[in-house]
């Protein structure tokens, strides 16, 4: 039976920590989509591990890990990340990771094109990680991409990669700094190294579900970066919500037990795009500093602002969360008052809008309606149970819960693994 962990905002909500906490009960930990643009850190036994492409279930020595079919797979990063985990003391990682043979390959060519496309866009650039994710999904959808299983057919692999490179060379000319023959030569070695990890993920997941294995699925990025439901075009190139999980892992929807939405107690975003509750004044800077808001993948500072419950309600409508994990509540410890967005308002008519519009022009024209809640002005990291929290912190939790209509079962109160209050545990199916 499956538990799915999904980001409910624009990413960086703290999904990795919950994955780490739930992973000891899982037999398989899987990723469905995205690429090595995702990033999160996990602290286990006093050691910090960074994950980008690999599932964080590798921290659990008793857990198998799977990279699903909708992931765009950067082969050098795969081996580099495994080596770094070994250097930090994780053992047997090579025997606990499998890769779907249906994954598309994210080449260095795609990263080169990613940078050039951002330059083309100028002031309208997306703010990508520059790791080739968008171009990889573009070639996938254009049916010109290379899948993992094709790496093992040398003739097909080389022909398709040269065709890709030639197509981009025609578009960008000498601006494209890329040697296709060098990449082909590198893959002669990767072809041999990658073979033991490659699996038919459809059969693998079918057998696991038939046997009743406990499967933990960690979403990458977040709903508001979804190619269909996010703030398009300021999104990633994959389906980051529940639909992408089902497609990317061929998971049986009837065997999903829990869909846990992870939501930060405030809001952050990396890169360009709309962010209605962004605070460019003192509060935003304070959130950024106290929350250490800069990216694991890029090192870029995150834009910061107040919690947007319009976004969370929209995200919930799409992903159908059965429970929420509210993270980084402790970052709000020193705020006298805390603002929460409860609606948007048309400044022309004064009419309140409780939905999240698709049209970014309409979104930009709307004002935010805030509700102010009292802060608690005391540290909460040492709180171990829900009723250890100050009443103002509990009121904040309960306001969110009632507004969205989903139980908040996990509350993050600090950076460590043990800084997590479990509440309403009966809402989580074991």
Curated annotation (Swiss-Prot):
Family of the protein in this entry: Belongs to the adenylosuccinate synthetase family.
Binding site for Mg(2+): 12, 39
SMART domains documented for this protein: Adenylsucc_synt
Cofactor remark: Binds 1 Mg(2+) ion per subunit.
Pathway: Purine metabolism; AMP biosynthesis via de novo pathway; AMP from IMP: step 1/2
Protein name per UniProt: Adenylosuccinate synthetase
Key word tRNA processing present: no
InterPro entries: Adenylosuccin_syn_GTP-bd, Adenylosuccin_syn_Lys_AS, Adenylosuccinate_synth_dom1, Adenylosuccinate_synth_dom2, Adenylosuccinate_synth_dom3, Adenylosuccinate_synthetase, P-loop_NTPase
Gene Ontology cellular-component annotations: cytoplasm
Catalytic activity: IMP + L-aspartate + GTP = N(6)-(1,2-dicarboxyethyl)-AMP + GDP + phosphate + 2 H(+)
Keyword Nucleotide-binding: yes
Its biological purpose: Plays an important role in the de novo pathway and in the salvage pathway of purine nucleotide biosynthesis. Catalyzes the first committed step in the biosynthesis of AMP from IMP.
EC class name: ligase
Active site: 12 (proton acceptor), 40 (proton donor)
One Pfam family it belongs to: Adenylsucc_synt
Biological process terms in GO annotation: 'de novo' AMP biosynthetic process; cellular response to cadmium ion; IMP metabolic process
Residues noted as binding substrate in the record, renumbered to the chain: 296-302
Protein residues bound to IMP: 12-15, 37-40, 129, 143, 221, 236, 300
Record PROSITE patterns: ADENYLOSUCCIN_SYN_1, ADENYLOSUCCIN_SYN_2
GO molecular function: adenylosuccinate synthase activity; AMP binding; GMP binding; GTP binding; magnesium ion binding
Enzyme Commission code: 6.3.4.4
Compartment(s) where it occurs, according to its Swiss-Prot or TrEMBL record: Cytoplasm
């Amino acid at each position: 039976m499956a538990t799915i962990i999904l980001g409910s905002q624009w990413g960086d909500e703290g999904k990795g920590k919950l994955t780490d906490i739930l992973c000891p009960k899982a037999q398989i930990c899987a990723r469905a989509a995205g690429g090595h643009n995702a990033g999160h850190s996990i602290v286990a036994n006093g050691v910090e591990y960074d994950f980008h492409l690999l599932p964080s279930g590798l921290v659990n020595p008793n857990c198998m890990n799977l990279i699903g079919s909708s992931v765009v797979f950067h082969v050098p990063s795969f081996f580099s990340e495994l080596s770094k985990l070994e250097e930090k003391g994780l053992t047997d990682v090579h025997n606990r990771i499998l890769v779907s043979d249906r994954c598309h390959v994210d080449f260095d060519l795609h990263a080169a094109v990613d940078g050039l496309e951002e330059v083309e866009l100028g002031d309208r650039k997306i703010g990508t990680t520059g790791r080739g994710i968008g171009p990889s999904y573009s070639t996938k959808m254009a049916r010109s991409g290379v899948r993992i299983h094709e790496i093992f057919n040398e003739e097909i692999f080389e022909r398709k990669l040269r065709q890709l490179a030639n197509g981009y060379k025609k578009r960008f000319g000498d601006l494209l700094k890329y040697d296709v023959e060098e990449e082909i030569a590198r893959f002669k070695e990767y072809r041999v190294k990658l073979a033991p990890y490659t699996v038919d993920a459809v059969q693998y997941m079918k057998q696991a579900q038939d046997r009743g294995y406990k499967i933990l699925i960690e979403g990458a990025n977040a709903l508001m970066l979804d190619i269909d439901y996010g703030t398009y075009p300021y999104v990633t190139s994959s389906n980051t919500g529940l639909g992408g999980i089902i497609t990317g892992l061929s998971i049986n929807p009837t065997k999903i037990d829990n869909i846990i939405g992870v939501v930060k107690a405030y809001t952050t975003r990396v890169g360009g795009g709309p962010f209605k509750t962004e605070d460019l004044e003192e509060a935003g800077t304070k959130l950024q500093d106290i929350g250490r808001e800069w990216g694991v993948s890029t090192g870029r500072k995150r834009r910061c602002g107040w919690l947007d419950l319009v976004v969370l309600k929209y995200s919930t409508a799409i992903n159908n969360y059965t429970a929420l994990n509210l993270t980084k509540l402790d970052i709000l410890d020193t705020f006298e008052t805390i603002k929460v967005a409860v609606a948007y308002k048309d400044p022309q008519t004064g009419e309140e809008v409780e939905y999240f519009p698709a049209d970014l022009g309409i979104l930009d024209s709307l004002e935010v309606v805030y509700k102010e809640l009292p802060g608690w002005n005391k540290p909460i990291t040492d709180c171990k149970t829900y009723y250890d929290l100050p009443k103002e912190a509990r009121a904040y939790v309960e306001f969110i819960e009632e507004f969205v209509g989903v139980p908040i079962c996990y509350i993050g109160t600090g950076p460590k693994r043990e800084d997590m209050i479990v509440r309403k545990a009966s809402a989580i199916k074991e």
